[in-house]
Amino acid sequence: MIQATYLLHMANIYNEGTVGRDKVPVIEGEHVAVMGCGNVAMDAARTAVRMGAASVTIVYRRTEADMPAIQAEYQAALQEGVKFLWQTSTTEFLGNEDGKVVGLRANTPEGVKEYAFDRICLAVGSRPASRIVSTTEGIETDDNGYVLVKERPFGMTSRKGVFAGGDVVHRPQTVVMAMKAAKSVAVGIAQYVDAVKLLSE
């Protein structure tokens, strides 16, 4: 069982030539299930296809109309051969005597069914860690718990001098995107510090 963000990260650094193919947690010929139906799930499913999976199936508890993924991502996944199990609510992951995942059991409109998979990738909805918000006054968040930040200086929260970036500000993405956000926030911090110095002179 793997996290979608981990799969995407390892695939990215494999494509960059930083690690070998054996570090990408999808083996050629495997039957892969991706849990969830957002943009990250679509990315993970398409990545698994490109890594040589025999089949990739997105398992989603709601209908096609309810999926949070944008249509462009969905259509791209279909074109690459990703399959979909709609209204399929997983109740149990199945394993063998060695502890290896061999499939899942789920409630479907036709009743309880079991599906065989070699690997399961988790791309379900997540919320950012809230400890920083609960222990620091004056930091505002949106309805989903993500920290609200300003464009100028980039990354500054509603509390003056406190900055945020990456997965605590938006949905989980790749490490590459987190690094990009960190660089942008660093520029915002530098601008803020320069402004404070200027005002104090």
Task: Please place each PLM-identified region on the residue numbering.
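Rossmann-like dinucleotide-binding cores of NAD(P)H-dependent redox enzymes
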Residues: 45-92, 196-201
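Structural/interface elements that position substrates and couple domains in central-metabolism enzymes
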Residues: 5-20, 34, 79, 88, ...
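Rossmann-like NAD(P)H-binding beta-loop-alpha module
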Residues: 17-51
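FAD-site-proximal beta/loop scaffold in flavoenzymes
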Residues: 2-29, 119-172
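Conserved beta-strand-loop-beta-strand element in the redox core of flavoprotein oxidoreductases
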Residues: 17-22, 94-114
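A conserved FAD-binding loop/helix module that cradles the flavin
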Residues: 37, 44, 165-199
